[in-house]
Every structure is written in C-alpha cells, then in structure tokens.
C-alpha cells in the first residue's frame, strides 16, 4: 500500500478467470482452420472468436491473433434448435464445425465441466465480459504485462480479465 493503490480497489472486484475449455485440442483452432470454416460456413463465423493465452499478452500490446476459440456456451444449442435431436440440429446448421468437433467426441463427452452437449463449453456467468472493453493480463508474469482490449478478444484460464464496467 505504500507503493500504490491495490488493483482490487479500482475494479469493484470484477476480476475474472479466462475460459477453461476442458479440451483445447478440439475447441482452440488455428487461423487457417478458422478462416476455412468461416469461408465455407458464414453462419459459423460468429462462433469463432480470437483467443489469447497468458503468454500472448504483452505490456500495452495485444499481438495478432494466433489462435481462435470455437465458442458455443452452455445452452447455445437448446436456445436455437427446432429439432428434438440436438446433434442433428448442430450438424445441419453448422456442418463444418460439427465435422471438426466430431473427431473429438469421445474425449469431449468425458469432460465433467461442459455444457448441455459435448460440443458446448462449460457454464460461465461472465461470458458477456469478453465482448466489452476490458483489461487482459497473464496470471503469471514478470513485471506488468497488461493490455486494454476494446472488446471481442477471449482469453484462456492463464489470463485474468478485469471488467472495465463500460
């Protein structure tokens, strides 16, 4: 306290952990894969978001995106589907994503922390924070490594997210 104000005094305790997928090999994709899926399937483009890890965050600098997240939170399928079979709806509406994720079905089904279906992410009360202006900082760093994101960048559990409240 002699050297400054604790960060918690400036944030209204709105400090959150980044996203835990439970299966990064399935849900975290390369820019090339993201571009191919988005080009073939424009409806799926909204489900592919920039994704950073703690080591990506630099002091005052957010580098070009090297990874993307397939972002389907818990409840995504049930809020949209018209068919009784969730996977059938998913495969019909997002065939390229369904094809990609189907390779990981066995592992994804075993995740304890997942959404309503194996292709959905775990529940989280603060997913909306990722769409707003926020500060991203790595959980482990030497010195201050933080960056202001104007909105839209998602981060893994090796990052903390400070909600700006805007």
Kindly label every feature range from the protein language model.
Residues 1-166:
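Polybasic, glycine- and aromatic-enriched phosphate-binding surface used to engage nucleic acids
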């Amino acid at each position: 306290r002699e050297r400054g104000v604790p960060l918690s005094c400036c944030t209204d305790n709105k400090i959150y952990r980044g996203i835990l997928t439970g299966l990064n090999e399935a849900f975290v994709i390369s820019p090339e894969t993201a571009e191919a899926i988005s080009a073939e399937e424009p409806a799926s483009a909204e489900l592919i978001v920039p994704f950073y890890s703690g080591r990506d965050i630099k002091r005052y600098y957010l580098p070009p995106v090297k990874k993307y997240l397939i972002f389907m939170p818990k409840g995504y399928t049930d809020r949209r589907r018209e068919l009784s079979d969730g996977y059938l709806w998913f495969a019909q509406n997002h065939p390229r994503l369904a094809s990609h994720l189907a390779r990981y079905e066995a592992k994804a089904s075993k995740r304890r922390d997942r959404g309503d279906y194996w292709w959905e992410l775990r529940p989280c009360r603060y997913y909306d924070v990722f769409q707003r202006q926020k500060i991203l900082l790595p959980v482990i760093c030497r010195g201050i490594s933080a960056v202001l994101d104007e909105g839209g960048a998602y981060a893994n559990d090796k990052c903390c997210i400070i909600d700006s409240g805007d």
